[in-house]
């Protein structure tokens, strides 16, 4: 994994697959939902929020404004769309989606944990 060139998309893909096959892991972004889509015991989650909530959160945490947020979101969308052929933000690409402007981050974490645990149990019961 460490022998890869920084920024190499093939390295990122291979690293995500190796780590996922090694054991439990959490990946944020980098098209991990797409890369791991054929792994049965993988749970992909999409976290989203309404624009006003995101704008306030970005300002609170990073001191950034909506213009910077919009640019960063466009970059993420372009990256995801280019490497997957799917549309970034389409909740149909995921097992589970949570609107984090409607629940606390702690509640979201609990929902994810319970969903993943139930999914694993259902896979074992088959």
Where are these predicted regions, by residue range?
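Conserved phosphate-donor/acceptor-positioning beta-strand/loop module used by diverse small-molecule
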Residues: 38-62, 66-72
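Loop/turn-to-beta-strand initiation segments
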Residues: 22-25
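Single conserved hydrophobic/aromatic residue that forms the stacking wall/gate
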Residues: 1-7, 11-12
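C-terminal helical "lid" subdomain and adjoining coupling/linker elements of P-loop NTPases
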Residues: 119-126
């Amino acid at each position: 994994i460490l022998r890869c060139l920084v920024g190499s998309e093939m390295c990122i893909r291979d690293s995500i697959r190796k780590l996922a096959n090694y054991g439990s892991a959490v990946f944020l972004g980098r098209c991990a939902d797409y890369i791991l889509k054929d792994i049965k015991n993988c749970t992909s989650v999409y976290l989203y929020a309404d624009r006003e909530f995101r704008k306030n959160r970005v300002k609170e945490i990073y001191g950034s404004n909506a213009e910077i947020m919009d640019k960063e979101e466009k970059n993420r969308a372009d990256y995801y769309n280019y490497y997957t052929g799917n549309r970034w933000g389409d909740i149909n690409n995921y097992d589970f989606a949570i609107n984090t402007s409607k629940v606390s981050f702690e509640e979201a974490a609990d929902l994810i944990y319970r969903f993943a645990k139930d999914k694993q149990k259902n896979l074992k019961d088959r």
